[in-house]
Amino acid sequence: MVSPVVLATTAMIVVFLLAQRYLSLPVLPNEPLLIPHWMPFFGHAFRFARSKRSFFRWANAKTGGQPFSVPMGGRRHYIFSDPADIAGIHKNGKTLSIRGFVRFIYISIWGFKPADADAMWEIKPEWHRMDIEWLLSDKNDQIAVQYLRRIEEQLRALDAEVEGAPDKAIVRPGLKTVVDVQGKATCQVLYGATTLEKHPGLLDDLTIMVRDGFWGLLFRAPRFLFRNAYEARDRIINTYADLVENIETRKDVSQYLYERTVYLTQQGISPQAQGADMLRTMFASLLNSMPTGYLALLHILAEPGLADEVRKELIDCGYLERSPEEMLEILPGKMPLLRSIWHETLRMHNNSLTVREVTADTKFMGKTKWQVQKGGVINIPCGLMHFNEALHPDPESFHARRFMDKELGGEGESHARTTKPFGGGSTHCPGRVFAEKQMIGLVAALLMRYDMGIVNADWKMPLVSEFDDITKQPTVWIRISKRV
């Protein structure tokens, strides 16, 4: 007689095989190569969740660097990384849409109600125009000048800490130092110093929300499982809702946010929904630039002599003689080494993912002709492009001068076509220009003001700049003293 265990196991295998057969889409001509998985519905989801960077690089190696597709979460995910293919995807925005992904993120991460997320999407053309006007045009200089002034204020507070130490030197966590200086300066510029005074734990709440609950929020896990993250998000949203309700009396808020708030209020967007939207803009303005600034600083301190070379570049372009208003005459245009370090740090550590939903069977021309099926999801992981040896020789190593012109002593690579840390197409991040000024402004100010060195000999460079990951890495301690 056959054992019940054997029968049950056999039945389970049969069910799995039937589900695999009938739930899987056929592979069409000109469709990226499918990497199958024995598990129905979930597919490669668990491997992806452990480390999307490792997963994409494993699959990419398995297919010889060609586009591929994987079953994951009940859908077929198409992965592209060649610049020509990416350009073809961005040209087909009607059937390769970001709408569903944006709605999902608005509700899951930022805490929008579904109706509010839909209302924001309907009026996106106008508020996105404001974003572009203030963040991509010359108007962003107004924000950048105020940011540089606020950086100076934060560094004066750090000066006092250094001067009060017995040997005129302090040892601080590197990431926390960047968050304190850059994070506070950015929040004061955009949302007003009053907002930070009323909620001094704003940046700590952002850290708690992302570090302790990003994935729980993303997949809408029960609140009791990620209570700290949910409560931190609530406090941030309520803080910004209070700002919206009192916008006419908050004279220190940026003109950019003021105009945006007035428009959204006129369109009937509630203070609570606008609070969620300000959380979104806070997230966007800090959670790429802060980790990148931190990692750029670590690379500079880790490479012998590089800090002094950066300081020489700054002195040569007249950094010491300039006020914040005058600084933008040289920042970042006259700082090719720092700009190259910025782009190289983004190349090595940015782990962002551009996502498009396939809303109709679509054929598009990239490096070759491709076909993708309705219901699928296109993923563009920038890391695959960033570590493509054909685009970036010796991709596993940090090259400070990789993106400097050859006539300046650099390697002459162009970041514009071969790196995608800020997405592309219609959703190309409008804050990318200000983000560069944020990072370079911060790192330049720190290096010119302080002697800095990494204290712990066993430290390791974090692999990725995602804030939820980098906050969980072992602390890198930095010794800080005033330069003579």
UniProtKB/Swiss-Prot annotation:
It is an enzyme of class 1 (oxidoreductase). InterPro entries: CYP450_sterol_14alpha_dmase, Cyt_P450, Cyt_P450_CS, Cyt_P450_E_grp-IV, Cyt_P450_sf. It is a single-pass membrane protein. One of its GO terms (molecular function) is heme binding. Its EC number is 1.-.-.-. Keywords: Heme, Iron, Membrane, Metal-binding, Monooxygenase, Oxidoreductase, Transmembrane, Transmembrane helix. Pfam families: p450. The chain crosses the membrane at residues 2-24. Induction: Expression is positively regulated by the oxaleimides biosynthesis cluster-specific transcription factor poxB. PANTHER family: 24-HYDROXYCHOLESTEROL 7-ALPHA-HYDROXYLASE, CYTOCHROME P450 FAMILY 7. This is Cytochrome P450 monooxygenase poxD. It comes from Penicillium oxalicum (strain 114-2 / CGMCC 5302) (Penicillium decumbens).
